[in-house]
């Protein structure tokens, strides 16, 4: 029993001495590292060993480069943050965030994945009437010659203007110059006209200095004056303007005049 006690005391003293020797060891002294950079015999401190043999400046340089995000990484991080906020409902977005990255659409366009609506300029009013094989062309030319003889026209009437006004004056309803339907039709003609039409109808000096909008407005007012004269002429001479359709007010005027001539006056 006593022998076991002495043995325990001896072991305790031995462990205490070993611990003291370890504490007194200089950890800054160099030692050999066979597997480190430089091969066998390279002297490294413990801290340098943890850096794989790199100097402190090199380690700092690598650490700085690793902490700097590339541009694409920053973009992905920002998108991830936006989607995270949206999923958590923290506010800041009323709709799903859009991608900040540029997308190359050339491949999608070539495959027909993205279609673009192609618009073409509208055809000019009554352009179809001027085809030489159109059976109505002789009648339009006759009306054109009749309208050109109307006194006090603001400018020389074109065939397009004559055909348009010939149709409007025979409308069943709304053929008066002051109606919205007439104004809208004349405005559309002014908007679809080209520079050649403006040069023909307007003062040459005005055309040189005016903008497109100013020329359209001036031409529109000229068309209004022209139609007012056509309207007055046709109601004074319905036989020269009627399209011979039953719905035409001019045709009804002609039929009414014929009825008055055929029927004898009523006497009491």
Curated annotation (Swiss-Prot):
What's this chain's function?
Answer: Effector that acts as a broad suppressor of cell death to interrupt plant immunity. Inhibits cell death induced by cell death-inducing proteins, including the PAMP elicitor INF1 from P.infestans.
Where can this protein be found? Secreted; Host nucleus
Query: Which protein, by its recorded name, is this?
Result: Secreted RxLR effector protein 5
What domain of life does the UniProt record list for this protein's source?
Eukaryota
Q: Where is this motif: RxLR-dEER?
A: 48-63
Keyword list, A-Z: Glycoprotein, Host nucleus, Secreted, Signal, Virulence
Instruction: Spell out the GO cellular component terms annotated for this protein, sorted alphabetically and separated by semicolons.
Output: extracellular region; host cell nucleus
Question: What does the similarity note say?
Answer: Belongs to the RxLR effector family.
Signal peptide positions are 1-21
Q: Indicate which residues are glycosylated according to the record.
A: 104
Q: Which residues form a coiled coil?
A: none
Relate the induction remark in this record: Expression is up-regulated at later stages of infection.
The UniProt comment on domains reads: The RxLR-dEER motif acts to carry the protein into the host cell cytoplasm through binding to cell surface phosphatidylinositol-3-phosphate.
């Amino acid at each position: 029993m006593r022998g076991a006690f002495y043995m325990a005391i001896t072991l305790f003293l031995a462990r205490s001495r070993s611990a003291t020797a370890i504490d007194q060891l200089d950890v800054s002294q160099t030692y050999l590292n066979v597997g480190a950079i430089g091969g066998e015999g390279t002297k490294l401190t413990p801290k340098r060993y943890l850096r794989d043999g790199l100097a402190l400046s090199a380690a700092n340089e690598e650490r700085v480069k690793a902490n700097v995000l590339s541009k694409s990484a920053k973009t992905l991080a920002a998108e991830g943050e936006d989607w995270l906020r949206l999923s958590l409902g923290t506010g800041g977005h009323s709709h799903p965030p859009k991608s900040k990255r540029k997308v190359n659409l050339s491949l999608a366009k070539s495959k027909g994945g993205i279609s673009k609506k192609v618009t073409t300029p509208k055809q000019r009013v009554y352009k179809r009437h001027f085809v030489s094989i159109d059976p109505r062309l002789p009648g339009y030319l006759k009306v054109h010659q009749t309208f050109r003889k109307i006194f006090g026209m603001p400018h020389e009437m074109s065939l397009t203007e004559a055909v348009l006004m010939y149709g409007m004056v025979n409308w069943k309803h709304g053929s008066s110059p002051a109606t919205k339907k007439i104004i809208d039709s004349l405005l559309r003609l002014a908007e679809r006209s080209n520079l050649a039409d403006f040069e023909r109808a307007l003062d040459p000096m005005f055309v040189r200095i005016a903008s497109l909008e100013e020329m359209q407005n001036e031409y529109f007012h000229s068309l209004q004056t022209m139609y007012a004269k056509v309207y007055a002429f046709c109601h004074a001479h319905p036989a020269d303007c009627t399209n011979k359709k039953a719905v035409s007010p001019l045709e009804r005027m002609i039929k009414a005049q014929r009825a008055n001539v055929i029927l004898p006056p009523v006497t009491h």
